């Protein structure tokens, strides 16, 4: 059978979109799905963090293997693992465990949820590999615009996923998880049949050394250069801040304002619409006009403003302020994410983009791990608003890290 050929850019975009849909269908419903097991923000943070730290541990291997064997085989491996992890998660939340387990084994379902997140995290290089494919087919001049497609997939996922998840949850709260499993299976079929290879054999690296597969040692190599250290550290701290409060955002809306799954989903749809507009249409012209560095600063300012609005919201003014804060947060994130990623990518060597962007994915995962756990713990101990105040402090540090003309103009060779 002759396979249909599609443009590489479109193939990477569809893969990213399908991956995001599988996650965003479930995301606004997560606290509701976990009610039968736990209501602790700390546990929710650890569940989010477990996925991230597993992704961090696997990121150097995924990046190095994609530079050695090509993008497509690694993408197939990653999506296959996601299928297993999501299906295990769906099975765990669907069973009525009280009918199967004695009291002494009551921790088994929660343990299976953590195992599912570990499996999904270890194989969670879909976004990183797709980002590498986009880097393969783009030039340094249009890389920020190309990376903006990640934001479009992110935005469309947040527009379509939460709405679909909420509609399905009216029949059963676990049905969206099974649909997410279906999206993962479709993604696997799509990657196998339609996604082209973008790394020619004559440009592939040798097998990596054992130390190259250690995520900590890879980060230490990059951090030897002071300018590279500051750029990568800023990337890490930003995602620690951002993913910290997003890990508890649905719980915050549910417990503080009594938001239903429909309202929680609506908040994510707002995020998706704005992210798609900013990263899909505005980011290219804005980068040409202002540059990645200025856009990063502006985006951080928007994120901080959104956090302030969320902390000021109360029962009487909850809906207007909450949605205003969420919208401004989305605007800021839409500016920062592609601008900061392009800023780093453009100043690192174009050789071994898989390893470079794999390390960035690792930093993002490590930041998510620490941010989610810290946010969940502070939510339980210091109150629901504390994660947002922590985000503001971390973002001030990011602004310090990326300040300075030498940092934004000098090229760094990894």
Label the model's feature ranges.
Residues 59-70, 278-292, 379-380:
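Helix-to-loop junctions at the C-terminal end of transmembrane segments
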Residues 169-182, 377-395:
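A membrane-interface helix-boundary motif in multi-pass transporters
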Residues 17, 85, 99-125, 320-335:
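Hydrophobic core of transmembrane alpha-helices in multi-pass small-molecule transporters
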Residues 80-106, 302-316:
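C-terminal ends and interior cores of transmembrane alpha-helices
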Residues 28-42, 247-264:
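Short amphipathic helix-loop junctions that connect adjacent transmembrane helices
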Residues 293-340:
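C-terminal transmembrane helical hairpin of 12-TM major facilitator-type secondary transporters
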Residues 1-4, 196-233:
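Juxtamembrane intracellular "pre-TM" segments in multi-pass secondary transporters
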Residues 114-155:
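Cytoplasmic helix-loop-helix junction between adjacent transmembrane helices
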């Amino acid at each position: 059978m002759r396979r249909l050929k599609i443009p590489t850019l479109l193939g990477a975009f569809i893969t990213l979109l399908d991956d995001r849909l599988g996650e965003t269908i479930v995301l606004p419903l997560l606290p509701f799905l976990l009610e039968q097991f736990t209501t602790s923000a700390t546990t929710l943070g650890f569940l989010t963090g477990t996925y991230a730290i597993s992704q961090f541990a696997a990121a150097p291997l995924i990046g190095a293997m994609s530079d050695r064997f090509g993008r497509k085989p690694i993408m197939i491996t990653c999506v296959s693992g996601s299928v297993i992890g999501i299906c295990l998660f769906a099975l765990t939340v669907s069973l009525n465990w009280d009918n199967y387990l004695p009291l002494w084994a009551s921790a088994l379902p929660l343990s299976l949820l953590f195992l599912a997140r570990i499996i999904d995290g270890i194989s969670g290089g879909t976004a990183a590999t797709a980002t590498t494919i986009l880097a393969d087919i783009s030039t340094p001049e249009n890389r920020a615009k190309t990376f903006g497609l990640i934001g479009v997939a992110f935005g469309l996922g947040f527009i379509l996923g939460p709405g679909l998840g909420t509609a399905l949850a009216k029949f059963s709260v676990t049905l969206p998880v099974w649909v997410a499993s279906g999206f993962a299976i479709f993604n696997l079929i799509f990657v196998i049949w339609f996604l082209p290879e973008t790394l020619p054999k004559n440009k592939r690296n040798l097998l990596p050394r054992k130390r190259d597969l250690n995520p900590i040692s890879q980060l230490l190599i990059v951090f030897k250069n002071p300018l590279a250290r500051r750029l990568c550290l800023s990337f890490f701290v930003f995602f620690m801040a951002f993913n910290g409060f997003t890990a508890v955002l649905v719980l915050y809306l549910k417990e503080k304002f009594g938001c239903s799954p429909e309202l929680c989903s609506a908040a994510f749809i707002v995020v998706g619409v704005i992210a798609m507009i900013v990263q899909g249409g505005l980011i290219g012209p804005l980068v040409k006009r202002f540059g990645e560095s200025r856009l990063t600063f502006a985006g951080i300012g928007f994120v901080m403003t959104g956090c302030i609005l969320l902390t000021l919201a109360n029962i009487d003014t909850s809906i207007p302020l909450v949605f205003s804060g969420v919208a401004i947060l989305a605007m800021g994130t839409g500016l920062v994410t592609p601008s900061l990623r392009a800023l780093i990518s453009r100043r690192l060597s174009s050789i071994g983009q898989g390893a470079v962007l794999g390390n960035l994915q690792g930093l993002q995962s490590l930041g998510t791990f620490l941010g989610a756990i810290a946010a969940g713990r502070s939510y339980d101990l210091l109150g629901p608003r504390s994660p947002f105040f922590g985000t503001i402090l971390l973002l001030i540090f990011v602004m310090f890290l990326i300040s300075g003309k030498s940092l934004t103009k000098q090229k760094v060779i990894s």
